[in-house]
């Protein structure tokens, strides 16, 4: 319902802009005596009236829906925007698309949220030669606020800021709903299809630190869209085709001549690749055979296909070890999947007159893009450009994707801009209807601020990095003497949770567009915005009820029977922070920057610490340590924090443990 209202509103605004422009043009021409009434203008006016009628019905339906109880968490910011949107439309019905700005307040003295629309509206009125101060506008907006269950009071501050104070009973009810029904977002995706293209290593080469960011960011993004109700297809566009397979297959034939009947023990594929490359560069006869193997591969020769599959399988086994360790889920759909579609792609571009021939190459110039696409090489072979065009068409027409997200490093930005522009040019999709976007990211740097390498200057193998992480996290746990209090099983679980959690969080907590410095020392530090700190904080929160002998059943019963009191300023601050979770996730769904979630989880953990230091959850006898009183509403606040943190961790792909 929300999406339909937004879609209809956007179309209405577009129609109104078109009407305005056409009316001005017609008035100008009429003044010259050139034109009668325009049927095009009348048609637009008629459609606009229909849209306004439909939009009003939708708004009324939405208000009815809002009154019904829901098991999902509420996006409070979004609800306040609806309330202030109604007030602004009622106060200034003649303004076209007035600004609607509602944000959480930065300081308690400014309330819980602020509406800062008055200044922008003042500027719009000034352009219409109406001089009204922002403060007067703010007063007018507040007079037109509809009755609602969210706002306790509003205050006008400074030049025209509207400070919004939420109702305590509303916040308390929302926290109770969260505890009873679990952490559930409003359904946003409505089963729209999202394709996330990420990881994408090359067959016959080991995954290295350069694949880390795409794999981690893509997995987390997929989890977020799934949680928001989208149908997500996670694709691994592996490099499993091309001339390099000719030399690998030729080398396989020489080294394991009976490969068709006996499975070859290739073992170290990286070494195998280097051996074949060395021969390819030094031996002309071998190079010729390698090219012959490429031709046979492209014609799907059965023996060559068997060799190709053997090489791919060895790589897949190596990739799987990393994906299993990091809990990554992917469907492999490599370049080979699109081979049979490429001929038709080239023909379609030729038939529409987009292809030019340059030195035997078939190229496509795309408006607004500096570098043309090469869709056929001078030797008749296809390129990455052809493969990516075939992939985007398959995803749009066969998968019927509503959103396609490519999680690939910043260095590929121009390539993807050109591919997307070419797909629009040929008419495959309309960017107003379908989102096709490149989620770029910076490189991983060493502590010397240069590209992360081994001491010998080689690229860091991803498996080596993960193993080093496991070693470092165990050292850290033993340093804290956790091996003396945890069982062997608990210690192992804590080791993997900290190791992989810290590696993922260190990546995701940085703005993805920036390069980031990889440092085990920093990421394993249990102070500051790190996974180590947050995982420890989570286990501490989970232990509060356990140490007070309160089990899950008691907490569930209390959630239904106990009113959550928010009288202490730290209780109120924590309650509001918990309920901001849906608006944080909505922001990430809009801009695709996951570090916002990390910042929020850290803020939630530090806000909890403030609350816990100021508000007794469990009151004990100082001499005996005996529990005298349990403040159950505060225990419920602890439980709500843990529930939101657990869901945040899940989206980030981090597995917390109960004991650490």
From Swiss-Prot:
The keyword RNA-binding does not apply. PANTHER family: ARGININE--TRNA LIGASE, CYTOPLASMIC, ARGINYL-TRNA SYNTHETASE. Keywords: Acetylation, Aminoacyl-tRNA synthetase, ATP-binding, Cytoplasm, Ligase, Nucleotide-binding, Protein biosynthesis. The alpha-helical N-terminus (residues 1-72) mediates interaction with AIMP1 and thereby contributes to the assembly of the multisynthetase complex. A motif ('HIGH' region) lies at residues 201-212. Interacts (via N-terminus) with AIMP1 (via N-terminus); this stimulates its catalytic activity. Interacts (via N-terminus) with LARS2 (via C-terminus). Monomer. Part of a multisubunit complex that groups tRNA ligases for Arg (RARS1), Asp (DARS1), Gln (QARS1), Ile (IARS1), Leu (LARS1), Lys (KARS1), Met (MARS1) the bifunctional ligase for Glu and Pro (EPRS1) and the auxiliary subunits AIMP1/p43, AIMP2/p38 and EEF1E1/p18. Interacts with QARS1. Part of a complex composed of RARS1, QARS1 and AIMP1. Its main location: cytoplasm. GO terms for molecular function: arginine binding; arginine-tRNA ligase activity; ATP binding; tRNA binding. The modification N-acetylmethionine is found at residue 1. Belongs to the class-I aminoacyl-tRNA synthetase family. SMART domains: Arg_tRNA_synt_N, DALR_1. Its EC number is 6.1.1.19. Forms part of a macromolecular complex that catalyzes the attachment of specific amino acids to cognate tRNAs during protein synthesis. Modulates the secretion of AIMP1 and may be involved in generation of the inflammatory cytokine EMAP2 from AIMP1. It is an enzyme of class 6 (ligase). It is found in: Cytoplasm; Cytoplasm, Cytosol. NCBIfam families: argS. The keyword Membrane does not apply. This is Arginine--tRNA ligase, cytoplasmic. One of its GO terms (biological process) is arginyl-tRNA aminoacylation. Gene3D superfamilies: Arginyl tRNA synthetase N-terminal domain, HUPs, Isoleucyl-tRNA Synthetase, Domain 1. Residues 1-72 are annotated as: Could be involved in the assembly of the multisynthetase complex.
């Amino acid at each position: 319902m929300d999406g339909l209202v937004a879609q209809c509103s956007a179309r209405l605004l577009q129609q109104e802009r078109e009407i305005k422009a056409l009316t001005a043009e017609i008035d100008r021409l009429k003044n010259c005596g050139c034109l009668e009434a325009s049927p095009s203008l009348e048609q637009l006016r008629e459609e606009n009236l229909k849209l306004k009628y439909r939009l009003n019905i939708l708004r009324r339906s939405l208000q009815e829906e809002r009154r019904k109880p829901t098991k999902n968490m509420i996006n409070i910011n979004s609800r306040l925007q609806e309330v202030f949107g109604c007030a602004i439309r009622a106060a200034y019905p003649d303004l076209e698309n007035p600004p609607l700005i509602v944000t959480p307040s930065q300081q308690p003295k400014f309330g819980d949220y602020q509406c800062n629309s008055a200044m922008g509206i003042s500027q719009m009125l000034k352009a219409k030669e109406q001089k009204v101060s922002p403060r007067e506008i703010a007063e007018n907006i507040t007079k037109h606020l509809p009755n609602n269950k969210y706002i306790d009071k509003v205050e006008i501050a400074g030049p025209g800021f509207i400070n919004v104070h939420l109702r305590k009973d509303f916040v308390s009810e929302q926290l109770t709903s969260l505890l009873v029904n679990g952490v559930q977002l409003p359904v946003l995706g409505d089963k729209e299809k999202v394709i996330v293209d990420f990881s994408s290593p090359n067959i016959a080469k080991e995954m290295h630190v350069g694949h880390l960011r795409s794999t981690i960011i893509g997995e987390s993004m997929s989890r977020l869209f799934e949680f928001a109700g989208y149908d997500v297809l996670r694709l691994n566009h592996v490099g499993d085709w091309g001339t390099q397979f000719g030399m690998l297959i030729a080398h396989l034939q020489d080294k394991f001549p009976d490969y068709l009947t006996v499975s070859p023990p290739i073992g170290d594929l990286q070494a195998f690749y280097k051996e074949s490359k060395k021969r390819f560069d030094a031996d002309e006869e071998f190079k010729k055979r390698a090219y012959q193997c490429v031709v046979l591969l492209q014609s799907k020769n059965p023996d060559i296909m068997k060799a190709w599959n053997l090489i791919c399988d060895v790589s897949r086994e190596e990739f799987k070890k990393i994906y299993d360790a990091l809990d990554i889920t992917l469907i492999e759909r490599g370049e080979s999947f699109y081979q049979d579609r490429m001929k038709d792609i080239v023909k379609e571009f030729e038939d529409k007159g987009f292809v030019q021939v340059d030195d035997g190459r078939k190229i496509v110039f795309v408006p607004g893009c500096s570098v043309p696409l090469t869709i056929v090489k001078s030797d008749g072979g296809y390129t990455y450009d052809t493969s990516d065009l075939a992939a985007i068409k398959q995803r749009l027409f066969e998968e019927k994707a509503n959103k396609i997200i490519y999680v690939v490093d910043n260095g590929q930005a121009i390539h993807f801009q050109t591919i997307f522009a070419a797909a629009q040019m040929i008419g495959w999709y309309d960017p107003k209807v379908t989102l096709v976007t490149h989620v770029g990211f910076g490189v991983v740097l060493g502590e010397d601020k240069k590209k992360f390498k081994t001491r010998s200057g080689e690229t860091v193998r991803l498996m080596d990095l993960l193993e080093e992480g496991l070693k470092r996290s165990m050292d850290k746990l033993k340093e804290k003497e956790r091996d003396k209090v945890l069982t062997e099983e608990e210690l192992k679980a804590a080791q993997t949770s900290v190791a992989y959690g810290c590696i993922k969080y260190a990546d995701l907590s940085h703005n993805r567009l920036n390069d980031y410095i990889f440092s085990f020392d920093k990421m394993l530090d249990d102070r500051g915005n790190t996974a180590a700190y947050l995982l420890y904080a989570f286990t501490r929160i989970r232990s509060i009820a356990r140490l007070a002998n309160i089990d899950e059943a008691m907490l569930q019963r209390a959630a239904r029977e106990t009113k959550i009191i928010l009288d202490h300023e730290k209780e109120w601050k924590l309650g509001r922070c918990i309920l901001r979770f849906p608006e944080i996730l909505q922001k990430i769904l809009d801009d695709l920057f996951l570090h916002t979630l990390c910042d929020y989880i850290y803020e939630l953990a530090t806000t909890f610490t403030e609350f816990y230091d100021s508000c007794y959850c469990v009151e004990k006898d100082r001499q005996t340590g005996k529990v005298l009183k349990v403040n159950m509403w505060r225990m419920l606040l602890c439980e709500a924090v843990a529930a939101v943190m657990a869901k945040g961790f899940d989206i980030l792909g981090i597995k917390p443990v109960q004991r650490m």
